[in-house]
């Protein structure tokens, strides 16, 4: 979707990815299939580019050092977002409020964390987990005794009593200008985003200003360029920070049809130094629904519905829990 947006602005995309079944490569001018740590391949790739960005935050940071001057956003955003502990401490330092947490490197650490923070809670790997992967729910202190703590560093997070979830998505230009899209209210099923709905509830609307203030501070502190997403829990005490994504985000896919300028186009505009586009919502009601796994087989049935816009990503295998596409439904409200 980003490559398509770039092409509409007259740019030719060159995709670098270790996997041969690259969906983005099918809509791009060039494709390099090579491991992340192949320095020669990465150097050749960089020689063909004026600017380099990413759409997946688990890209290894170390191999990017030789091409840092081409990167937007700066790789410090990746370094921060790739480690849940580092991310939470960073946000706390800016005045944000995350769930209660503690680093866990052993069974003893986990027992101490559960004793201090309480249960229920979630044990998460500090790196590489997304869409509910690398997570273990702990309902009681006794559950913690039965969990084999992974060899990789983990973090324990206390349960947050929340009414709903929402995202703050912004775009920041090279000149420091920041624009926000309206915040969608998000529903997750099994740790995977199911729907993003606008307008959000009154509770979300009340908490968006404080959440935006934090997101703007994060972008400023990182010297960020491009689209940045912060996810929040809406609670009785105010917005609680969940996690950040230094990239275009699934909860912003609705902007393709539902906003004056999509998150994908504005990301390209930002990293290329172009003026940012209008982020206003252009429909009275917007609902983005993810198409997960085998549901993709019946996805075309939605095309008979007024206001439905289908996006299938072209992924070859429909696995359980895999995002195969999305449909955005636009209404007058």
Regions found by a protein language model. Name each.
Residues 209-230, 235-236, 246-294:
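Active-site "cap" helix and flanking loop/linker of ATP-utilizing ligase/carboxylase catalytic domains
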Residues 269-333:
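Peripheral (often C-terminal) accessory segments that flank ATP-dependent C-N-forming ligase machineries
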Residues 1-89, 93, 108:
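ATP-binding N-terminal substructure of ATP-dependent carboxylate-amine bond-forming enzymes
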Residues 191-201, 243-256:
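Short, flexible active-site loops
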Residues 39-48, 111-116, 145-149:
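Short amphipathic alpha-helix with an adjacent loop that forms part of the alpha/beta core around
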